[in-house]
Design a protein with these regions (language model features):
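Conserved hydrophobic/aromatic pocket- or pore-lining residues that grip, position, or stack substrates
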Residues: 94, 111, 155-158, 166, ...
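Arg/Lys-rich amphipathic alpha helix in sigma70-family domain 2
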Residues: 160-169, 304-307
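Conserved tyrosine-mediated DNA breakage-rejoining catalytic core shared by Y-recombinases
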Residues: 12-14, 177, 192, 225-311, ...
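Short, basic (Lys/Arg/His-rich) helix/loop patches that form interaction surfaces
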Residues: 123-124, 198, 202-205, 215, ...
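Short, surface-exposed polybasic/aromatic micro-patch for ligand or macromolecular engagement
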Residues: 2-58, 77, 283-285
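Basic, Lys/Arg- and aromatic-enriched nucleic-acid-binding interface segment
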Residues: 124-132, 136-151, 164-225, 235-238, ...
Length: 354
């Protein structure tokens, strides 16, 4: 039952409910008019009678999402990058704007307002949950529709669970998601591929791009290859290489949260006190594991590259730090995906014709 009590010029609705631990709790809600109090009284009595009563909660969006995140990571055995990406969405694109709002006070128009705000927000405005000062040039590059779609998907999935957990009666996330932005990518013709490779003087970049073009590899997959993945005798001497690992650099805090079953190796830190780790992990799915036929040109380049690795190690075997990877720096350390990206962007700047 719910009771109405007049308090000065306002009316209070008092009712008793059981919290999630089965403890009996009294709650008072104040209204300026008797009509509003009566309406709320009937609503409470109906919800209590039908078992649809929502236990009052002051939990905020930030508190809920930071509780939801590790639970989902553990349940679905997320890869480090998946956890890190979702954490970044929460810290940088959700909490700064609606993090302090109480979950039960959130309405669809709040979410729509968030999407509108984000559509005008510069990329990198927040990093690690902290606001950054951006240059005028940086402020012109706003978040893409694809990023907004990712925020929507995270809110949609997490708030459905908030309903299951009894925090919400209904999710406030709108049904319609922000539209993804699609960007057409030009695909090189065979002659363009050859011309591009011919213009690459950096041997590491040349091999990385050559492997990428032949096998449609991601940067992490290229960096994750080892000499053992190369088989020159396979396919009647044509040669193949196998893709079944990916290299990533992730936050050490992330590694503490994720299931380590997919992690094959954690590389030693280059710098003392580093907050990130370079890891080698399984590829995303079984479909991502594949064996790729070499072209004659790639086969020859790989043979020369492996000979080069032997020569570099023989120059100073005591100081050579053999990472065991196919792509290595002259000192034997692994070539990270970000280095491949930097080398490619530098080449791109020097060759705008491609």
């Amino acid at each position: 039952m719910a009771y109405i009590t007049k308090r000065g010029s306002s009316y209070s609705v008092r009712y008793t409910y059981q919290d999630e631990h089965g403890k009996s709790c009294d709650k008072w809600e104040s209204f300026p008019t008797k009509e509003e109090a009566v309406k709320r009284q009937k609503q409470i009595e109906h919800e209590l009678a039908t078992g649809n009563f929502l236990i009052p909660s002051t939990v905020t969006v930030a508190e809920f999402l930071m509780d939801w995140l590790p639970k989902q990571c553990s349940k679905h055995k997320w890869a480090p990058k998946t956890y890190q990406s979702n954490l970044a969405l929460i810290q940088n694109l959700i909490i700064p704007y609606i993090g302090e709002m109480q979950m039960q006070k959130l309405r669809p128009y709040h979410i729509e307002a968030l999407y509108d705000t984000l559509s005008k927000t510069p990329c990198g405005q927040y990093v690690g949950g902290k606001r950054r000062d951006l240059s005028p040039k940086q402020q012109k590059r706003t978040l893409s529709g694809t990023t907004l779609h990712e925020v929507h998907q995270l809110l949609h999935n997490s708030f459905l669970l908030a309903v299951e957990w009894g925090i919400l009666i209904k999710s406030p996330v709108p049904v319609e998601a922000p539209k993804k932005t699609t960007q057409e990518r030009s695909i090189w013709e065979v002659d363009e591929m050859r011309a591009a490779l011919d213009s690459m003087e950096d041997s590491i970049l040349h091999l990385a791009v050559h492997l990428t073009l032949v096998g449609a590899l991601r940067e992490g997959e290229v960096a994750g290859l080892t000499p053992e993945d190369i088989d020159f005798d396979a396919a009647n001497g044509m040669g193949t290489f196998t893709v079944n690992r990916s290299m990533q650099r992730v936050q050490k805090d992330t590694l503490a949260q994720v299931d380590k079953g997919c992690i094959l190796r954690i590389f030693p830190d280059k710098l003392e006190g580093s907050k990130t780790s370079l890891i080698l992990k399984d590829t995303k799915t079984e479909a991502s594991c594949r064996t790729i036929f070499m072209t004659a040109a790639l086969r020859e380049e790989l043979k020369q590259w492996l000979e080069r690795l032997k020569r570099e190690e023989a120059l100073d075997p005591e100081r050579y730090r053999n990472s065991g990877m196919l792509l290595r720096l002259p000192n034997g350390l692994a070539v990270e995906p970000v280095l491949i990206r930097k080398k490619f962007l530098k080449w791109q700047d020097a060759h705008p014709e491609f």
